[in-house]
């Protein structure tokens, strides 16, 4: 929402809005309220909002308690008016992954099948054929102070959001090869019983429209710059920069 920032003495960093006065006529609606006493996940962060099929579509990271702490997952919800929202559903679940290929710091702190931490600054992409894709990245946090977006995570995953807001199966859209992970070394597991989770590369599916949408996304270099942090050692595809936001001006130039 819009915040008036003129002649303000101090900002209260303990408040989400800085304690600044809101503009008249602005309303704020809460999508989710969590209560730790009920066992609910209270770390809810990184909202990604788009419009699709006449509804608002929102995804965000939801974790048990802390940033970069497991278990966490990406969930999503929809709304017709931005006021009333559906109960959140899992988009990208909490998983484990094989750490043999991990080449980052503090490897000795990781078990063979380590808890994955989701991290992403870009989720939704609607391709020219109308397909709506959702993505996130799965990384590792060997300890609480080691972020999963340090370039040594495993892979970015993708799935399609259908017109009825159900989801396709999960696929890999990009392995973090610069960080040590390839198709042959990237293996996911269920946390409840350590059983394998089959997540193929996106081009192995028979759905040509989905494959085309994923390939189109991978061809959009400017959009892929939003993936930089998680794959920062892939110098072939990325320039140095963090959390890129951009828009197209009236003259066609890109402002970032």
What are the functions of these language-model segments?
Residues 1-42, 51-117, 126-256:
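Beta-rich carbohydrate-recognition and catalytic domains
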